[in-house]
Amino acid sequence: RNSSSAASDVYKRQPLRLFQTDNPVFETLQELTVIDQSAKIEEFQPEIFGLLEIPDINVNQYVVSGTDELSLQFGPGHYLGTKLPGSGGNVGIAGHRTTYGAPFSRLDLVEIGDEIYLTYGSNKYHYIVDDIEVVDANTGDYVLFNRGDDRLTLTTCHPRYSARQRLVVSGILTRIESGN
């Protein structure tokens, strides 16, 4: 046998090791998942629903369409299936309280009588808060039902750092400011 043939045999018997390194790029599968989620976020372009303003707690935030996990990473989301502003029903919007920019971090400071504005299309809808409640997360869907009036309902997790309950702030439509 010649030496190149012997070297070739040794090479063939070595296990194939791709990405062999002392410093792996990903320490755990969890890190890889985080990277994968980041890639999904970069690819995802949410549809903007409107602009939400709550002056008393310094909220001035774009609202996206949808309340799925990915959409809510970009800001508050309009519950699909709830009404559009000015259409004679309940407009539902959910937002995070402690993560992803925490757009509703101070929602618990809103009081009855506070003003909330939602710009949708070319109109600005003015709402006055008339109801604040805390409901169980598993049974609180009724807060999004239509009550026979034009209203806006905001929901977020309650208490902070928990998903057990929902803080629900609701307001009645008082005025539509035309942008035309």
Where are these regions (language model features)?
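Alpha-helical transmembrane signal-anchor/signal-peptide segments
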Residues: 13-29
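Single conserved hydrophobic/aromatic residue that forms the stacking wall/gate
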Residues: 1-7, 11
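Membrane-proximal extracellular/periplasmic loop immediately following the first transmembrane helix
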Residues: 29-35
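Extended boundary segments
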Residues: 35-82
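Extracytoplasmic/periplasmic soluble domains downstream of a signal peptide or transmembrane helix
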Residues: 15, 64-180
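Extended hydrophobic/Leu-rich segments
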Residues: 10-14, 32, 52
